[in-house]
């Protein structure tokens, strides 16, 4: 697991979305041998709860999450599985 990369992803999401809950996992080991793994980009999953998601559609929530780490996509992040919830949904 790349702890530095995880902390950078976490920091970017926290700065952009002020989550009340954030669980971020490096799932790269589950994708060893996958074509995307060769590029060095990791596979991650995130469960994030933020007030910014209240009243937002799923596609908007995902866009907000992707936007928070946009500069890392396709180089350091190959895949990101997202569960994005509003506090009222927890």
Task: Go through each PLM region and give its residues.
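C-terminal structural segments of small proteins and small subunits
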Residues: 58-90
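Conserved interaction-surface patches within small, structured recognition/assembly domains
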Residues: 45-55, 78, 83
């Amino acid at each position: 697991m790349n702890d530095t990369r995880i902390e950078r992803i976490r920091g970017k999401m926290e700065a952009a979305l002020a989550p009340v809950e954030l669980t971020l996992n490096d799932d790269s080991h589950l994708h060893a041998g996958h074509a995307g793994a060769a590029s060095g980009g990791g596979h991650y999953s995130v469960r994030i709860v933020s007030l910014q998601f209240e009243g937002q559609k799923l596609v908007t929530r995902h866009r907000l999450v992707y936007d928070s780490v946009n500069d890392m996509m396709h180089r350091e992040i190959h895949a990101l599985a997202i569960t994005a919830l509003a506090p009222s949904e927890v």
